[in-house]
Curated annotation (Swiss-Prot):
Belongs to the asfivirus MGF 360 family. One of its GO terms (biological process) is taxis. This is Protein MGF 360-7L. Plays a role in virus cell tropism, and may be required for efficient virus replication in macrophages. It holds the Pfam family ASFV_360.
Length: 376
């Protein structure tokens, strides 16, 4: 049962009783538990967002209701926990973050299932949050929550990360020995960039500025041109274009990432050389042509951008790699060539998408498809 005090707070907040507060009232509001972050607490029923002072629901620092609950649980703010549950926050998220026995008991009294403290439930919750793309809520629950991270079995934990990441993190952090904490953070950060979840990206970039270069690399690798443009031109985060291009080339069918690096000044012939070396490496690992279709698509796209397969360095590479008959045949027969739609270097993300869409519509790729079919 909720106290009269909690119910009174609920009514006052919902009716925006503190929207025009005086600075002298701030201490009293804090003592009464009516303060959130840097101002009087507010709640938007429509958006289910907890806000502070004059903050809007779309503000990067606004909290979804379940995130606000997790924060209140971590800070042992009893009345706020009850208040957020009244607004239908999921108390099961709270019990996962309770730091004291008293708060844990309160969560159970409010309806939390104690089974959510079991390893299996914690693991399943992680998977469910991936499906729902609740990046910030997941980070609030799992990041810096040593009890949860240590409760995961080492094999299961890394199997989950590797399955969804497909080795991606290690491709960008080969020399870094990451803790579970860092692995979890980068896992969710990558998810936000992959699906272009603007608010989580902005929130995380503000909270973890030491990962700015990593963020740009990730955006390039995944072909998120909106984030590349934002990091590069609005935040002045810069990396050498050819280095960025080498990352873009490694992600299958990454036309957006490759084009953007090309428009920034990366050498397209160097990109083609990188891809040929990669394909040769895969051939020696006995990975078939067909399973590497996405990388072959990148090769085709680089040539469409003007890369010259007849350069001395590329021809020398082809001569050395006797096993890669397909590539030699492809280049020797002249099946591929530059595409006129790609001769301009555009950096505005929406225009880049239009160019790539037009290219994909007009580029039939018949010769490449025919070659592939004849080799089956």
């Amino acid at each position: 049962m909720n106290s009269l005090q909690v119910l009174t707070k609920k009514v006052l907040i919902e009716n925006k009783a503190f929207s025009n507060y005086h600075e002298d009232d701030s201490f009293i509001l804090q003592q009464l538990g009516l303060w959130w972050e840097n101002g009087p607490i507010g709640f938007c029923k429509q958006c289910k967002m907890v806000i502070s002072g004059s903050m809007s629901c779309s503000d990067v620092d606004s909290y979804e209701l379940d995130r606000a609950l997790v924060k209140a649980v971590k800070e042992n703010q009893t009345d706020l926990i009850k208040l957020f549950v009244l607004w239908n926050a999921d108390i099961n998220y709270g019990i996962m973050c309770a730091k004291t026995e008293r708060t844990k008991v309160l969560c159970i009294q409010l309806g939390a299932n104690p089974e959510f403290l079991d390893n299996k439930k914690l693991y399943n919750m992680f998977v469910n949050l991936v499906r729902q793309q609740k990046v910030l809520l997941a980070i609030d629950i799992y990041y810096d929550n040593i009890l949860i991270l240590d409760s995961f079995g080492s094999h299961d934990f890394h199997a989950l990360i590797n399955f969804i990441y497909n080795g991606y993190i290690l491709n960008l952090d080969e020399k870094e020995k990451m803790t579970r904490n860092t692995l979890v953070l980068k896992f969710w950060y990558k998810l936000a960039i992959e699906f272009n979840l603007i608010k989580p990206i902005r929130f995380l970039s503000k909270k973890f500025p030491h990962l700015d270069d990593w963020r740009l690399k990730t955006a390039v690798y995944l072909g998120n041109v909106d984030e590349i443009h934002h990091a590069y031109f609005q935040e002045n985060i810069r990396l050498e274009p050819n280095h960025m291009m080498s990352l873009a080339c490694m992600y299958p069918q990454n036309k957006l990432g490759i084009y953007y690096c090309f428009a920034l000044g990366a050498n397209i012939n160097t990109a083609l050389e990188t891809l040929i070396r990669f394909i040769n490496h895969e051939v020696y690992r006995e990975i078939t042509f067909f399973s590497n279709y996405g990388i072959w698509s990148n090769i085709h796209f680089c040539i469409s951008l003007g890369a010259n397969p007849d350069t001395k360095k590329i021809q020398e590479t082809l001569l050395r790699e006797e096993k890669n008959v397909i590539m030699k045949l492809l280049f020797k027969k002249g099946f591929l060539g530059p595409h006129s739609i790609l001769h301009k270097k555009i950096l505005e993300p929406s225009e880049v998408r239009k160019i790539i869409s037009t290219y994909e519509y007009t580029e039939t790729f018949h010769s490449f498809s025919s070659l592939r079919d004849n080799l089956r």
